[in-house]
Amino acid sequence: MRMEILIPRTDIEIETAYLRLSTAHSLGCDTETSGLSSRTGKLFSIQFSDGDLSVLLPLSEGVGLGPLAMLLADREVTKIFHNAKFDLDFLNAAGIATANIFDTMLAEKILTR
């Protein structure tokens, strides 16, 4: 089975993406930025995936998070990041709330001590 990729740009497309991802218990998440520091860089995009659907939200095109912001803040949904500290720094700087974060980089460090 091939993963479906959605790049929503309209409110209806963002709502559709939210409705499809909102049933997931966990989501893989990632950000793309213009630099390594949230003080000088910008948040370009946020990606979400439930394993069947990948959503790339092109913030650099002026697209807003809309209801997808609720997924990042939802304590019932585990958001899986690699090196979450980096992504969360940019998300926090943009005023985007997050909860229930799992960091694969930290997990790897703990498990391979």
What feature does the model see in each segment?
Residues 1-113:
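Conserved RNase H-like, two-metal-ion catalytic cores of nucleic-acid enzymes
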